[in-house]
From Swiss-Prot:
It comes from the Eukaryota. It is found in: Endoplasmic reticulum membrane; Nucleus membrane. The keyword Coiled coil applies. Residues 10-192 form a coiled coil. Keywords: Coiled coil, Endoplasmic reticulum, Membrane, Nucleus, Transmembrane, Transmembrane helix. The keyword NADP does not apply. Its main location: endoplasmic reticulum. The gene is TMCO5A. Belongs to the TMCO5 family. The lineage of its organism: Eukaryota, Metazoa, Chordata, Craniata, Vertebrata. This is Transmembrane and coiled-coil domain-containing protein 5A. It is a single-pass membrane protein. One of its GO terms (cellular component) is endoplasmic reticulum membrane. InterPro entries: SMCO2/5. The chain crosses the membrane at residues 224-244.
Amino acid sequence: MEISRLAQSKRNIISLNMDLERDTQRIDEANQKLLLKIQEREDKIQRLESEIIQTRGLVEDEEWEKENRTTMERERALQELEEETARLERKNKTLVHSITELQQKLTRKSQKITNCEQSSPDGALEETKVKLQQLEASYACQEKELLKVMKEYAFVTQLCEDQALYIKKYQETLKKIEEELEALFLEREVSKLVSMNPVEKEHTSQNNEGTPTQKTARLFSKKIFCCLFFITLFFIRLLSYMFFHVRFINPDLLVNVLPKVLGRSTLWKLRCFFFPSLTLETEDMLPH
């Protein structure tokens, strides 16, 4: 009975070992498939990231070129407006100076006319009146021209103020857009760093450092180590069960089983080897 039980347990252990080997083979195949899928995904992610970086760089370059072009155009327009205002101011000063000179001339001529009226005859009076009318007409034309120039000057100054305000607002919006872009970029980088696991980092660094042959060698050694570890755990568990059975359930198991399993010569060798630690009961069992 005991021999049949031992044979049955041996068969069970062999079948369990075979099942374990099959399971480990299946796990190895599944791991290889998963590793291939992970490598494909990583390649795809790297490709997508490179494409995103290229497109983003192109878009940012185009936006910066457009913004620089618009700012340069606005600055050029502002410079032209400033030059126009300076020219109009110079023209206004010359016109004011000429008007003051004309007013002085008119006052002088009016004084002369009054003096002539008092001293000269009627013909000279008519000539002076005609000249005075001509001078008044030219003065009116110059005054109209001065009003026109003043209106243009006011319009140009208003345009300059509006342009400066628009440029200020445009610069503020540009700063806001730059800050928002920097914040978005930082958020993306932080989310990437948070989402990445330390194990994934090590895995990616190892993938970047090592060659495919080194990767496969490492994986194979890891798998062998795992298999050996699990097998040793299994045998340690079996030995612990055996020790528990011999210690607490059936202490005479070895005494009953050894003579049936081993021959007399092997039992004699065991007796010689384990003689100091043998009890009287087992010593009586062994051959003399």
